[in-house]
Amino acid sequence: MKNIIPKDTRYIPFTQQNSCCVPTSINIVMYKEGLPLIPQELLGYYLGLILEKKYKKLFWDVRTGKRPPAGYGTQMQKKQFEINSIFKKLKIPLKVTPYPIKYFKNKKELVLFIFDKIKRNKNLIVLLASDVLNKTKNNNGHACVIDRIYPAKDLIRLIDPSAVQPKWREIKIDKFIKAIKSHPTGQGRILELTRIK
């Protein structure tokens, strides 16, 4: 029988609402961890979600305004939207540990880090430049869940919440690294989400 989805996937993909890649990626992890889900729009709001005015009608209530440097979406880099504080506020039993791309000395170190985390069934979300993944010129940040890494094949598989991209995306590791380094605000990083008791 043909594989309809990857046999070794660790996640059930979800599809994002406009500009909600971060909260949707978090919900993908929450579902895997057996945690109660909350609407991506609500989680996004608390993480500083801001939209272009023309998309306001897609939401019950949302901030609109000037386009931030990384594009429309969440604003976790601002103190009032810091992810661990928001998780506490919303009683989400997860803790985020960020790993900026500069944390890794080279490709080998990054690959070993991801490989080890996946081997131990840890949850990783990557913040990167969508332009590198999608061959566009929109200057937007994007978030995906890291599903698997295959060092021998030089591939990494992401769960992409975008409505217009494949849910399971395999890309070359060098392209993955370039996408992280090319994040529009230099905030490209890997977030490890750990369940807290």
Named regions from a protein language model:
Residues 66-143, 147-149, 194:
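Predominantly the structural core of cysteine protease catalytic domains
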Residues 46, 50, 86, 117, ...:
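Residues that form generic nucleotide/phosphate-binding pockets
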Residues 18, 95, 119, 137-140, ...:
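Noncatalytic regulatory segments and standalone regulatory/sensor domains
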Residues 28, 130-133, 163-165:
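Solvent-exposed loop/turn segments at secondary-structure junctions
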Residues 39, 100, 129, 170-172:
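Short, solvent-exposed coil/turn linker segments
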Residues 1-81, 137, 152, 196:
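Active-site-adjacent structural segments surrounding the nucleophilic cysteine of cysteine proteases
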